[in-house]
Design a protein with these regions (language model features):
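Acidic, proline/glycine-enriched N-terminal capping motif
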Residues: 1-153
Length: 153
């Protein structure tokens, strides 16, 4: 992906085609820290796209009225990677996933029920950060996938 990054504080993001990447520099053991940090980034700095339900008539319906099979709303794959240096931090990955999904909801997709694939991993890296990759799996018409995520390395 060669798109330019938009940055505000410790958060940066970019998008191209059906992929959005979000990175947060640094780590903390408090998962709740990430939600307001990412929300602030999207509120103050992000000028990229937002999820769309299509026509005005479609927007009038509640998300709970959308089909759960992804038809009309699209399904997504989300990969969350915690890169650390030295000893791994004591942070429950399920709490991290919930905080990140809550933070990007409304920016990458409408509702976390649209997430059909979720991968959360902790790994040693060159610098401490949280890296999130969101990919659209199905078209707005519920058709064939745009991208299939390769198997976990």
């Amino acid at each position: 992906m060669e798109a330019a990054w938009t940055q505000h504080g410790k958060v940066r993001a970019r998008e191209a085609e059906d992929v959005m990447e979000v990175e947060v520099d640094g780590l903390t053991t408090q998962a709740k820290y990430y939600k307001p940090l990412i929300h602030e980034f999207f509120r103050k700095a992000w000028r990229g796209s937002r999820p769309s339900l299509g026509s005005d008539a479609a927007r009038a319906f509640s998300l709970r009225d959308l089909p759960r099979d992804g038809a009309g709303s699209g399904e997504f794959s989300v990969e969350i990677r915690m890169d650390y240096v030295g000893d791994p931090p004591w942070l429950d990955l399920d709490n991290l996933a919930k905080a990140i999904l809550d933070a990007i909801k409304g920016h990458a997709f409408h509702d976390d029920a649209q997430v059909a694939r979720l991968l959360v991993e902790r790994r040693e890296g060159e610098r401490e950060r949280i890296a999130v990759t969101v990919r659209r799996l199905t078209g707005a018409d519920g058709g064939a996938p745009f991208h299939r995520v390769s198997e976990v390395r």
